[in-house]
């Protein structure tokens, strides 16, 4: 099978999952799945989520190499799904305290299933830029990664946080550093300077998880 369209249609047929059910599982519109199945979209950024939802080999689905791997490997024994949370933009994140209670389903860019300690009170953001990408450190979050943010989790020095400076409409993603009475928002990338914060910043939430999609 040479195309993503052929492989996805084959996987849907074998698993008995409909396009609408697959779209619901990964929190996107059915139209997006339909475009892949019809061949209108030769690639998809949702390939990893589709593979997880169908319990097939993600590498096979993306490239055609290897075996389909129905219900095997880490897909079969993956962590329990705890709920679905909205992937929002950085302006929405900056106003999350005000908009969270009345947030409408269609206001999200997409809805993502979450695992582990995340819960339905969390939200997700797609990382922009390379300020949190550390070329030499163990902790590094690249551009394009999806972070799961928990507004209810207490923060401390060293926490990765989403915050909004008083003079900005957008939220920002940094590491919180507390040194005595001084507080800073510190990028993990040493090429960027730390930002002093002392009463001019709101911590919106603590990052629980980072998810990296390879396709």
Curated annotation (Swiss-Prot):
InterPro entries: Cro/C1-type_HTH (IPR001387), Lambda_DNA-bd_dom_sf (IPR010982), LexA-like (IPR039418), LexA/Signal_pep-like_sf (IPR036286), LexA_repressor (IPR050077), Peptidase_S24_S26A/B/C (IPR015927). It comes from the Bacteria. GO terms for molecular function: DNA binding. CDD domains: HTH_XRE, S24_LexA-like. Gene3D superfamilies: lambda repressor-like DNA-binding domains, Umud Fragment, subunit A. Residues 19-38 bind DNA. Keywords: DNA-binding, Repressor, Transcription, Transcription regulation. The keyword Glycoprotein does not apply. Residues 8-61 form the HTH cro/C1-type domain. May control the expression of the integrase and inhibit excision of the mobile element R391, and regulate the expression of other genes as well. This is HTH-type transcriptional regulator for conjugative element R391. It comes from Providencia rettgeri.
């Amino acid at each position: 099978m040479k195309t993503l369209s052929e492989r996805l249609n084959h996987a849907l047929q074998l698993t008995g999952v409909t396009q609408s059910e697959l779209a619901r599982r990964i929190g996107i519109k059915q139209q997006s799945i339909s475009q892949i199945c019809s061949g209108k979209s030769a690639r998809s950024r949702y390939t990893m989520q589709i593979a997880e939802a169908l319990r097939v080999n993600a590498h096979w689905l993306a490239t055609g190499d290897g075996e389909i791997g129905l219900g095997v490997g880490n897909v079969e024994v993956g962590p329990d799904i705890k709920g679905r949370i909205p992937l929002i933009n950085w302006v929405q994140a900056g106003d999350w305290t005000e908009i969270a209670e009345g947030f409408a389903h269609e206001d999200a860019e997409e809805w993502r299933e979450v695992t582990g300690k995340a819960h339905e009170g969390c939200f997700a953001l797609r990382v922009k830029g390379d300020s949190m990408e550390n070329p030499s450190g163990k902790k590094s979050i690249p551009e394009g990664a999806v972070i799961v943010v928990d507004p209810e989790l207490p923060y401390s020095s060293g926490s990765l946080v989403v915050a909004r400076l008083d003079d900005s409409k957008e939220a920002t993603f940094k590491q919180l550093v507390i040194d005595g009475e001084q507080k800073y928002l510190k990028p993990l990338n040493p090429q960027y300077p730390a930002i002093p914060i002392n009463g001019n910043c709101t911590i919106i939430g603590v990052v629980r998880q980072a998810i990296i999609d390879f396709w």
